[in-house]
Amino acid sequence: MPHRIHSHQSPPQEINMTFKSAITVSLVEEARGGPFVYWEGLKDACEKSAALGFDAIEIFAPGPDAVDESELKGLLQEHGLVVAAVGTGAGMVKHGWSLTHADADHRAKARDFVKQMIDFGGKYNAPAIIGSMQGKWGGDISRDQALAFLREALDELGPYAAQYNVPLFYEPLNRYETNLLRTVDEGVEFCKTLSTDNIKLLADLFHMNIEEADLAAAIRAGKGYVGHIHFVDSNRQAAGMGHMNHEPIIQALKDIDYDGYLCAEAFALPDSDTAAKNTIEAYKRLTA
């Protein structure tokens, strides 16, 4: 009778993908009323988000020097939080800078500002986000020229972010905010034309609800490119407060092995505390 060899190897284990929760805090007074949950400073945001069980904060700061490094690191340590990402939109909101502006000096200033924000985020291992600073085409600038300027910028800024071992997030926006790239698929195809592989897409569910025919299918098609999620509802309020069906979206994220943040870039409606509470309740229900 042949000798039977017994294997001591354990059966393969199913990988348990774990999402992480994050919430936005704006320090930019000029953006007051915009889609950010917390507005009363980092101390307030850290205390309240940690108490609710969030894993991280996403910071929208007016500039790289607006935050005291030792203070923020102390708050993060005290409350068991990290920084999920940092926005660069203050470059547009405060200065009107765009990466696709017709003037070369203007574009250089825009890139320098983004680099400074990459440096700021790098202190906390947090990627920076290119959203509104991508600009638009029109006037003397054709769409092809604007996309060439954007490609030039991302090919410079992506490798710059790599020194901190983080990607740079590029966010397709809806038609009312940009006329460049508006869908995940357009973002993926654009990324394929870059010389850097350090650009990941930020998929914002609010923008996607306007531009995508099928949000879950768009996310699946973005496998390997989607690096960050803005987790909101159809009306840009907290998840659960609009008419979006989040279950297929969460399943799609699981299908592409997404293990990043679901971050609430939502209006503080009816107020910050309620928006935060609604968000974490929806997050826990959907990711249980």
Where are the predicted features?
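N-terminal pre-domain/capping segments
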Residues: 8-122, 155, 196, 280-288
